[in-house]
Amino acid sequence: MSNAREIRSKVQSVKNTQKITGAMELVAASKMRGAIVKMNNVRPYVESANTIIKNVTAASIDYPNPYLFDRDVKRVGYIVTSTDRGLCGGLNINLFKHVLKEIKNNIEDRVGFDVCVIGSKAENFFAKLKDVNIVATAHYNDKDKEGSIRAIGGAVKVMLDKFTAGEIDRLYMSSNQFVSTIKQRPRLQTLLPIQDIFSAEEIKANKEKATKGHWDYIYERDIEEVLNALCIRYIEAQVRGAILENAACEQAARMMAMKNATDNASDIIDQLKLDYNKVRQAMITQELAEICSGAAAV
């Protein structure tokens, strides 16, 4: 058993670590609130873009937009979002396991795949794997928002160009979904082709509108060109929304990880104090025994 001085030193060391984890918990909680605000702010833009695409598509019902329709899947693309920093529990590794499960299914079905990674954790993880073709990388830095947006936009454009050129037939976005402060779960959503734009009822209504005539926008350019640009903006907004939601998940996971670390530090301190008291008790008992032995000898 360690002596009393060593135990006191350990207690002080754990207390210092506890102060750090407690401070990191508070910082993560503050950043999480800001990230949730940003996440919620981007949603109205995505919903508005969705509505406009519906209206424009209804006006050009016969135009076979490549971003809207399914085709035979021979190769797929993944945009994988992760964090740049650690200390956020199993947030990243759970997401990577989810993506690898999908990739394994593709390999079994003889479907090829390309990967675009956002965040250093995803870049480091997938770079170590064999047979994973990383075609683009980007990082999101909250201190350099404009530079990050340009870098992410460039990475997304690489995947969009591959889809337009027919090099990939489906594009997925892998990120974490913010369920609550204590719960985040991996999510894989289809970016291209744009799915669930119309329900069956909406498709029927749009066909009736197209035959009867209805209101429409005034286009400065060709309607097909406008629709293509809208689809690209919509995809970019979806990616940005997923990145901001993943950032909120990161801060929530880090806050909980630091809270657990702080609580564990309290448990360790209690155990060390108990060990210290046992050592002190043994020392006192030994001293009393020596005094009694000395008195008996006299």
From Swiss-Prot:
F-type ATPases have 2 components, CF(1) - the catalytic core - and CF(0) - the membrane proton channel. CF(1) has five subunits: alpha(3), beta(3), gamma(1), delta(1), epsilon(1). CF(0) has three main subunits: a, b and c. GO terms for molecular function: ATP binding; proton-transporting ATP synthase activity, rotational mechanism. Produces ATP from ADP in the presence of a proton gradient across the membrane. The gamma chain is believed to be important in regulating ATPase activity and the flow of protons through the CF(0) complex. It is found in: Cell inner membrane. This is ATP synthase gamma chain. Its main location: membrane. InterPro entries: ATP_synth_F1_ATPase_gsu (IPR035968), ATP_synth_F1_gsu (IPR000131), ATP_synth_F1_gsu_CS (IPR023632). Keywords: ATP synthesis, Cell inner membrane, Cell membrane, CF(1), Hydrogen ion transport, Ion transport, Membrane, Transport. The keyword Membrane applies. One of its GO terms (biological process) is proton motive force-driven plasma membrane ATP synthesis. The lineage of its organism: Bacteria, Pseudomonadati, Pseudomonadota, Gammaproteobacteria, Thiotrichales. GO terms for cellular component: plasma membrane; proton-transporting ATP synthase complex. HAMAP family: ATP_synth_gamma_bact. The keyword Repeat does not apply.
